[in-house]
Structures are given as C-alpha cells and as structure tokens.
Regions:
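Short functional hotspots where side chains directly engage DNA or cofactors
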Residues: 220-224
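Core catalytic lobe of class I
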Residues: 1-219
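Class I S-adenosyl-L-methionine-dependent methyltransferase module
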Residues: 90, 226-227
Length: 227
C-alpha cells in the first residue's frame, strides 16, 4: 500500500448528475464505477422479499444512467486518464457505444473471471462465470507497474460478507486503481453502492469521491468508509 496521505473520502448522497455538475473540469485522476447494467437485476438466491438484496437496483431498467454519466466523466477527467466501467455481458455492446459517443476510446475488455459460474437457467444457457471491466481512455493513459493480461481472476465476495448484491472484490478494484492512477489522485465512483471502490482507494493511497442515490447503500458505504 502507498504511504501517501490522502484526504477523507468525499461521499455524496443523491443523484450523480447533480454531484458531478459541481466537480471542476479536468480534476479527476480516474473513474472506476459499477453502474446499473440495464438488465433489471434482482438476485434469484433470495426468497424473502423483505431481505435487503431482494430489491431492484435504482435505474437498472436500461443504460440511461451510464448514457447521462459518460459525458460528465469525460469532462471531469484529467487529460490522459482512464474510466473503467463494469458491465454485464448482455449490455456490453451498448455500453461501448455509449462510451465512444462520449469521446472515449475503448482500449480493453478486461474479463473478470469469478472462478465459479452462476446458476441462472439450468436447461437453456451455460453458466456465466465472468463480467467485463471496460477500460476506456481519455487521451493516452499509461499503465503503471506490471502489464497484466486482460483476464483477471479474483473470487467473488463470499455470500456471508456481501454488503451489496453486485459487490466487486476489493482486490480486483485495487488492481485497476494501482494500474491506472497515481498515488494521491482523486478517483471518482458515480455509482458507489456499498463503497468497495472507496476501500480500494484507501488501501492504495488514492483520494476518493463517491455518489450513491439509494439511501440504504449510502448508509452502508458511509459506515464502511467513514466509520
């Protein structure tokens, strides 16, 4: 972990659009985010409708949230910096079009290999074992440290430790942060969920700014990062 002293995380409750309008242009060192995938995701593992994971993710009916966020990502990012966006297989092509329309170059489709496939439709489809992290460039970012291949193998967060139904392992996020930003840089997550990106930034010596519209998950992130 880097020894650079960073300011406390800046957490914003509410819609990312209002928050990002207040961010100065060319002030963010990296965007790393896991936006709504546009697949109306609900976990099939939960039978109790009152369980915290038995809820639709805000804005997950389509990719309109990413469509609104992408131009603002381009505006607030410093020259020669990266936006890394997680996306589902089903909506990957559409997400790439959105990022390109905002002015980004899609450099890599980084495959996150979870090590075990999901259940899903047992008679019609093969088990899904990966998600994609789109590495998108504003200008020409440089890769710091090791040049990793484009398949990253990290196990999923164990079910008994999940704080969000689509939570990403912090170690996976650390690799992205360390590879595409410098110590002390401000990393932005417009859809921070339970705050995993913020934890990765704290471990890596990066400043963090995150937005979350869902009051429940904002509270989870606040307790995780500010507690």
């Amino acid at each position: 972990m880097d020894s650079v002293k960073t300011p406390p995380p800046r957490l914003i409750a509410g819609d990312f659009e209002h928050a990002m309008l207040r961010i100065p242009s060319r002030s963010i060192g990296m965007v790393l985010t896991d936006p709504p995938y546009g697949i109306a995701y609900k976990t099939g593992m939960r039978k109790d409708r009152h369980h915290r994971f038995c809820r639709e993710i805000e804005g997950d009916r389509d990719l309109s949230a990413l469509e609104r966020a992408a131009p603002e990502m381009m505006r607030v990012l410093m020259p020669d910096s990266a936006a890394c966006v997680f996306m589902a297989q089903e909506t990957l092509a559409q997400a790439e079009r959105i990022m390109r329309s905002a002015g980004f170059e899609v450099v890599n489709r980084i495959v996150w290999d979870k090590g075990a496939h999901t259940m899903g439709d047992l008679t019609h489809a093969f088990g899904k074992r990966y998600e994609v992290l789109l590495y998108c460039a504003k200008g020409r970012p440089r890769i710091r440290g090791r040049r990793w291949p484009d398949v990253w193998r990290f196990p999923r967060v164990p079910q008994n430790r999940l704080q969000h139904q689509n939570e990403k392992p912090v170690e996976l996020l650390e690799r992205a942060v360390e590879s595409l930003s410098d110590p002390g840089d401000m990393v932005l997550d417009p859809f921070m969920g339970s705050g995993s990106t913020g934890e990765a930034c704290a471990r890596c010596g990066r400043a963090f700014m995150g937005c979350e519209i869902d009051p429940y998950y904002y509270g989870v992130a606040e307790a995780r990062l500010m507690g």
